[in-house]
């Protein structure tokens, strides 16, 4: 087996945990955004002793988190280069891509022009057209849908267009065909959504249930990522949480679904107990979905503290030749205006038991530096973007 600096690299993306406005925040209407800083203020101090040990407060002062005199990890921050601040853009950039055209989000629903085209091409009416929880919108509009056959169209804070239909009203093959039409229409730059999702359900009013026949029509990454290179070289790429959806299954050797952040940490612990060579890639989405978009700083703070409390289990299972990297994909400051993501730096923590000490890493000008470091470690084809910091980890 080749002599890799690290046999296993565990990447943990704390979805939306930004660490202060990016230099180009003004272009995104995000001046003053500071996800971690503002949560810490609202909580009157965050209790994250394990992240403190890793050096989190050395990146930026955070209320309640002391700057440990001798941090155990290398620490720094990364700036997003791509033109966007959504989950797909952040993750694709982490794995070596540069995204010029941002994916669209529709916090006020989709434009009439798009929906009229969809109606015309499907022969069905449309109801809903707003951001909503998938179960709540069925309670609200399921009965009307059953009477009229109109499609329930809704979105979320992410770049998605979801179409819900009762399996006895709109047969599955028709719903899938409708979603394929929607996918085609939204390849137009002005409607460019990351995913179309078919959301079939069954049951009666008051007792609707979504079925397992969900189908995603995602965009595949437009170029090869570091994950493709690892997989082609026979290495393991273990996706945990929504990672597989984000990359539309590209470059992934196995995928573990998660129900929550804590379930994600359980799956990470399980993965730490297995023998593999390659990467494990975990996304913890609750920070973003449950607290950031809902502008709930206290809930967000508690979730951060719960995450921190799970880290000793991870530390205990790390081997000498493992590397743990903790970062984020964008910000989502819960005290910022609106409900959207925020353009921020993201933290970068790199920890291994074999590190002699720790030090500050230079600020990365692109998230792709992380992907380049992974590629460098596994001696595979380097991405077009990004500069490896592997040699700095000693």
Curated annotation (Swiss-Prot):
Its cofactor is Mn(2+). It is an enzyme of class 5 (isomerase). The keyword Isomerase applies. GO terms for biological process: 2-deoxyribose 1-phosphate catabolic process; 5-phosphoribose 1-diphosphate biosynthetic process; metabolic compound salvage; nucleotide metabolic process. Gene3D superfamilies: Alkaline Phosphatase, subunit A, Phosphopentomutase. It is found in: Cytoplasm. The keyword Lipid metabolism does not apply. Binds 2 manganese ions. GO terms for cellular component: cytosol. This is Phosphopentomutase. The lineage of its organism: Bacteria, Bacillati, Bacillota, Bacilli, Bacillales. The gene is deoB.
């Amino acid at each position: 087996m080749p002599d890799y600096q690290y046999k296993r690299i565990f990447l943990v993306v704390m979805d939306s945990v930004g660490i202060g406005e990016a230099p180009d925040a003004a272009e995104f209407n995000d001046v003053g955004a500071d996800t971690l800083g503002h949560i810490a203020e609202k909580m009157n101090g965050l209790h994250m002793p394990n992240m403190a040990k890793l050096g989190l407060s050395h990146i930026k002062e955070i209320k309640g988190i002391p700057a440990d005199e001798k941090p155990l990890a290398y620490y720094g921050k990364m700036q997003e280069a791509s033109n966007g601040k959504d989950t797909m853009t952040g993750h694709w950039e982490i794995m070596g891509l540069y995204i010029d055209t941002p994916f669209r989000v529709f916090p006020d629903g989709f434009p009439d022009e798009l929906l009229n085209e969809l109606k015309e091409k499907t022969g069905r009416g449309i109801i809903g057209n707003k951001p909503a929880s998938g179960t709540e919108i069925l309670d609200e509009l399921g009965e009307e849908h059953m009477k009229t056959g109109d499609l329930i169209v809704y979105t979320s804070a992410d770049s998605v267009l979801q179409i819900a239909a009762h399996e006895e009203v709109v047969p599955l093959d028709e719903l899938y065909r409708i979603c394929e039409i929607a996918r085609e229409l939204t390849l137009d730059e002005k409607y460019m959504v990351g995913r179309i999702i078919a959301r079939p359900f069954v049951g009666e009013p008051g007792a609707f249930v979504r079925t397992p026949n969900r189908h995603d029509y995602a965009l595949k990454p437009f170029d090869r990522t570091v994950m493709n290179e690892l997989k082609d070289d026979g290495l393991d790429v273990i996706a945990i949480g929504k990672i597989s959806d984000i990359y539309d299954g590209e470059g992934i050797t196995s995928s573990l679904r998660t129900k929550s952040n804590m379930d994600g940490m359980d799956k990470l612990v399980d993965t730490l107990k297995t023998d593999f060579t390659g990467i494990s890639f975990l996304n913890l989405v609750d920070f973003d979905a449950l607290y950031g978009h809902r502008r709930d700083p206290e809930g967000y703070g508690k979730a951060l503290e719960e995450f921190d409390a799970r880290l000793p289990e991870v530390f205990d299972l790390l081997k000498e030749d493992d590397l743990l990297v903790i970062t984020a994909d964008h910000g989502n400051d819960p005290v910022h205006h609106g409900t959207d993501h925020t353009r921020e730096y993201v933290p970068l923590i790199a920890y291994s038991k074999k590190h002699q000490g720790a030090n500050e890493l230079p600020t990365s000008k692109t998230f792709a530096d992380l992907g380049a470091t992974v590629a460098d470690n596994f001696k595979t084809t380097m991405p077009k973007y990004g500069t490896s910091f592997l040699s700095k980890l000693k």
